[in-house]
Design a protein with these regions (language model features):
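Short, surface-exposed helix/turn micro-motifs that flank interaction/cofactor sites
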Residues: 27, 54, 61, 146, ...
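Long, hydrophobic, amphipathic alpha-helical segments used as structural scaffolds
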Residues: 102-106, 149-153, 169-176, 216, ...
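An acidic, carboxylate-rich microenvironment
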Residues: 17, 41, 83, 133, ...
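Short linear motifs at protein or domain termini
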Residues: 1-104, 213-224
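Mobile beta-alpha loop/short-helix "lid" or hinge segments that flank ligand
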Residues: 62, 66-67, 161-163, 177-180
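Conserved amphipathic alpha-helical segments that form helical-bundle/coiled-coil interaction surfaces
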Residues: 87, 108-171, 183-192, 200-211
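Short helix-capping and inter-helix turn/linker motifs at the boundaries of alpha-helical repeat units
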Residues: 13, 112, 179-180
Length: 224
């Protein structure tokens, strides 16, 4: 199904849904950095008012996904290298905290299925170069941690970070050896969570993010 036909299904949508559709296009790189979002085209496509489109632009701008530039309009944000390092610094702290809270709050046995998922299934997926399976494992891990951490402020901050770094994360798993390293690192995090050791789980998760930042530093000219 082509993009035009897919998009025809989302006409006349609510303000929240309009934001979500545009967010997904940006995060998936259907709208890559530097792309211009044109009010007139969007009002026609979605059959909504220009005021509603501007409202959606305001939400996306607050999330750091677009910027509104005088005489140019709304443009998808292009991350600079320094910003990416800053995002990794914040992710390290916040993801570490999420893992800590999840470990402290979740009942025993909560992580058994994820431990199994990151075992043979994830390893076999990497061996056959099924990186989408690995990315899905990461998404499941994040969602479960967010649910168990049960902190709406923290989860909102992390959602914003994931939106801004989603494409980069997908590119990073293509770096030789990175996906397998990620599986091993998540195995270690989950083992600590399964044991109820919040201190170790947090530190292990923070090392995982530092490792990702180091991989980005090594291969950044191929990733940007």
């Amino acid at each position: 199904m082509n993009e035009k036909r897919k998009r025809s299904r989302v006409r006349g949508i609510s303000p929240d849904d309009l934001v979500e559709v545009l967010r997904r296009r940006i995060v998936s790189h259907d709208l890559p950095p530097g792309s211009k979002l044109r009010e007139v085209e969007l009002t026609t496509e979605f059959e909504v008012s220009r005021a509603r489109v501007r409202e959606a632009f305001g939400v996306l701008e607050e999330r750091g996904l677009i910027e509104r530039i005088p005489n140019r309009g709304a443009v998808v944000t292009r991350l600079e290298v320094e910003q990416i390092y800053e995002l990794y610094e914040v992710r390290e702290v916040l993801e570490g905290l999420a893992v800590r809270l999840a470990t402290q709050k979740a009942p025993p046995g909560s992580w058994d299925d994820l431990v199994a998922l990151f075992g043979q299934p994830a390893e076999e997926a990497i061996a056959r170069n099924d990186l989408e399976f690995y990315i899905d494992c990461i998404i499941q891990f994040r969602e479960r941690c967010a649910q168990a951490a049960d902190n709406s402020v923290l989860n909102a901050q992390l959602d914003g970070l994931y939106d801004r770094t989603g494409v980069l994360i997908r590119r990073l798993v293509l770096v030789p050896g990175r996906a397998l390293d990620g599986v091993r690192q998540h195995q270690a995090v989950l083992q600590a969570m399964q044991a109820g050791d919040a201190d170790l789980a947090e530190e292990t998760k923070r090392r995982n993010i530092r490792s990702a930042a180091e991989a980005f530093a090594k291969y950044q000219k191929y990733l940007l």
